[in-house]
From Swiss-Prot:
One GO location term (cellular component): cytoplasm
InterPro entries: Diketo_gul_Rdtase, Mal/L-sulf/L-lact_DH-like_ah, Mal/L-sulf/L-lact_DH-like_NADP, Mal/L-sulfo/L-lacto_DH-like_sf, Malate/L-lactate_DH-like
Protein name as catalogued: 2,3-diketo-L-gulonate reductase
PANTHER family for this protein: 2,3-DIKETO-L-GULONATE REDUCTASE, OXIDOREDUCTASE-RELATED
Length: 332
């Protein structure tokens, strides 16, 4: 089915207010969920909203909490989210990293005691729109087996890197082949995954999203490489924030809350003039996309460039929402 941005935001806003969230906070949170969905990231927008409400009702998310600065070391700051709303706090933290970068050339904010930030790419994009390189990542509850294991002991720990090119170039990737959100998107659409995304119950690689969602044997991105990246990203976020690791979140909490996140902004224009920057970025993009295609009908893509097209299509034609997901939201 198709809905408008206004319908989507109104539905989110209604549910948030009915759960006791104040009007201003509800409006800002609903706006972010709707913008994420409008951008084509359904897995971490509309599809994720019922799960967000579940955590709100369980008390994992404290809607009136505000992040608090703990330590300041010039270009580096450490904050405590105090279990505030994840997407609103993440936006504030990237804004703060940008402010630090404006003064120091680079800004790093380490955040502890945070909640799920929904679409991580929003915060990298936020920096790139202002002309900064944006880098951020988060840890999570253990939802992926380390390479060579059957039991979940590491997080998918998504990493975002956004470059202020025209259009913005951005990698937004979990350390698994697919996020659990994308497994859900493919399952709801009745599709197999395009490549193997995990193991079945017999230990064979599989493209069946429902099987992987159930047994939690999701495949690390690049096999042992994604497993290793997940571990070191967790270590850095834990140390810099003085927050909880994947092990602590998993063993000490009843659900995924109190996690650790990193936000970095780099002011490129302190290092290179604008025309030179633009020319170098354009040459990189042209060089990559001019490679001979393996399939003449399949264009060579640059990461993140599809979001400009998706946003325009959704604004023109309406936003696609799965019927069952919309029914869940209407019933909340």
């Amino acid at each position: 089915m198709k809905v408008t941005f206004e319908q989507l935001k109104a539905a989110f806003n209604r549910v948030l207010i009915s759960r006791g969230v104040d009007n201003e906070t509800a409006d800002a949170c609903a706006e972010m969920f709707a913008r994420t969905t409008e951008s084509g990231v359904y897995s971490h927008g509309v599809n994720r909203f019922p799960r967000f409400i579940q955590q709100l009702e369980n008390g994992d998310i404290i809607p009136d909490a505000q992040p608090k600065r703990i330590t300041s070391l010039g270009a580096i700051e450490q904050w405590d989210a105090q279990r505030s709303i994840g997407n609103l706090t993440a936006k504030k933290m990237m804004d703060r990293a940008i402010e630090l970068a404006a003064d120091h050339g680079i800004g790093l904010v380490a955040l502890r005691n945070a909640n799920h930030w929904m679409r991580g790419g929003s915060y990298g994009w936020q920096a790139a729109e202002k002309g900064y390189i944006g880098i951020c990542w988060t840890n999570s509850i253990a939802v992926m087996p380390p390479w060579g294991a059957k039991e979940c002991r590491i997080g998918t720990n998504p990493l975002i890197v956004a470059i202020p090119s025209t259009p913005i170039t951005m990698v937004d990737m979990s350390m698994s082949m697919f996020s659990y959100g994308m497994l859900e998107v493919n399952r709801l659409a009745g599709r197999q995954l395009p490549v193997d995304g995990g193991f079945d119950d017999e230990g064979n690689l599989t493209k069946e999203p429902g099987v992987i969602e159930k047994n939690r044997r999701i495949l690390p991105m690049g096999y042992w490489k994604g497993s290793g990246m997940s571990i070191v990203l967790d270590m850095i976020a834990t140390l810099l924030s003085d927050g909880a690791s994947v092990a602590e979140v998993t063993e000490d909490n009843s659900d995924e809350y109190g996690i650790s996140q990193i936000f970095i902004a780099i002011e490129v224009d302190k290092l290179i003039d604008g025309p030179t920057r633009d020319a170098k970025l354009q040459r990189i993009m042209d060089y990559v996309t001019s490679a001979e295609r393996a399939d003449e009908n399949q264009a060579i893509r640059l990461p993140g460039h599809e979001f400009t097209t998706l946003l325009a299509e959704n604004r023109r034609n309406g936003i696609t929402v799965d019927d069952s997901v919309w029914a869940k939201i209407q019933a909340l």
